[in-house]
Amino acid sequence: MAVTSPWFRAVVSAAQMQEIENWLFTQGMPVAALMEKAALQTAQRLLTLYPLSTYPRIGVVVGPGHNGGDGLVVARELKLQGYQVQVLQPLDKLKPLTQNHVDYGKSLGIPWVDGVQALAHCDLIIDALFGVGLTRLITGAIADLITTINNLPIPVVSIDLPSGIETDTGEILGVAVEADRSFCLGLWKRAYFQDRALAHLGQTELLGIGLPPQAIANVLGEVWPVQVLGADQAQQTLPLSRPLVTHKYQQGHLLLICGSQQYAGGALLTTLGARASGVGMVTVAVPMGIKALLHSQCPEVLVKGLLETPSGAIAGLGNLDLSRYSAVALGPGLGSDVGPLVEEVLSVNCPLILDADGLNQLAQQQLLPLLAVRTAPTVLTPHGGEFKRLFPDIDQGDRLTAVQTAAAMCQATVLLKGAKTVIASPTGPTWAIKDSTPALARGGSGDVLTGLMGGILAQPEKFDLAQRVATAAWWHAQAGILASQQRTILGVDAQHLAEYLIPACRQWLGPNVANWPANLSHSS
């Protein structure tokens, strides 16, 4: 079976991971061999990150299953490298393979300790209690053990997943280890993209364990159902190369409908995001009262002044010809007193992005069913509160399932904003944005994203719409990360975020930036 995506992009459930492993075992791979591969990769990474000179004393907390077995192999390897290792095994009943590693570890002289306080003098604690697949609540002595570990002033590394986190939903099963670092083994697990798990994961890293591509494809198919978007995909998705002979109208024409007297900045920030996308033309439709502001701040865009309500919001689109544009984005800064704009734009025969007050109007006027009959694609970009108003019956606890359910329900591409933004469409894979920054938790950040996304969707298509939406979210996050590195988390206001979009692009393109066509023949 052909494989179209590198293994490190796949995101799997506990059941899918178990099925992949079972396929390996039916093909003849010993369970012990897979455990050795996973644990040796973990041990090697620990040797790099936690050198003997700084972290000589290691405590390993092991559970009854194969996660505990992984921990015991790690304990063995660290012992052989000169670390002072001790093991805490709070449960007596073990799987046979795990028991084998207990016996071997004791034969090497690794000490077993009886209580968590015996680990208080350690320099590092390794959590190998439960890992992937746990579904029951943690109570009693084990809950007390985890609470004590969390209260110790010692760094904790979890193997595969912090103990106490449900693998698929990220739910905290009563109590969970608060790791400083988590090594995800083999393939990303869904919990790594659930906001409610993030406080327990710490820094995250995927460790390859040599899973054959055919094993993954046998379970997930040729295209992974849930994928992490990476820099290489973003680069391929963006229209970075252009024909030698081109002009602005061939590079897309984006219409932004946004802004009000109260939220004039929303229109400006959306425009700044669009400007960075490379789209050929941008038209901004705003209330007449803020038209001059847009002209003065963004002289290269076309500004349409629209009739406004007494409070300074857009009253209606008037004679605006929606057929002229290759994408339309509506919502940022419109305010609550805006006219019935959403119903007016639903007829556009091009990608339509609804954000902010556009989403609120969609919910208030119960227009969601109309999206299913649109002939052109629709993109909804809610944060958690807007999502609840649009889809009150969908539980957001499991964000991946929630966004997939919403996309299927309304037949639109849905981007659910959060610390881990996720994107789903009615067909095709669900995308997850792995890296972001809390610096983006600022007013106007979403406006910049809407403009950037609109500019990308307005340009000639290279990949499916959901992947282009995900690329906009990924680029937006990378700009936030770069800006926070240079300005600190406190210094990333939305205007500066927009200014970092192109520097972020140059950074992840690296040497390839020199390969962009530098001498394009064009007409303005």
Swiss-Prot record:
- Identify the cofactor(s): K(+)
One record GO biological process: nicotinamide nucleotide metabolic process
How and how many cofactors are bound, per the record note?
A: Binds 1 potassium ion per subunit.
Annotated region NADPHX 2: the residues are 383-389
Q: Where is the YjeF C-terminal domain?
A: 231-508
On whether Lyase is a keyword of this UniProt record, the answer is yes
What the entry lists under CDD domains is as follows: YXKO-related (cd01171)
One Pfam family recorded for the sequence: Carb_kinase
Superkingdom of this protein's organism:
Bacteria
Q: What's this chain's function?
A: Bifunctional enzyme that catalyzes the epimerization of the S- and R-forms of NAD(P)HX and the dehydration of the S-form of NAD(P)HX at the expense of ADP, which is converted to AMP. This allows the repair of both epimers of NAD(P)HX, a damaged form of NAD(P)H that is a result of enzymatic or heat-dependent hydration.
In the record, the note on similarity to other proteins reads:
In the N-terminal section; belongs to the NnrE/AIBP family. In the C-terminal section; belongs to the NnrD/CARKD family.
Q: What is this protein called?
A: Bifunctional NAD(P)H-hydrate repair enzyme Nnr
The organism is Synechocystis sp. (strain ATCC 27184 / PCC 6803 / Kazusa)
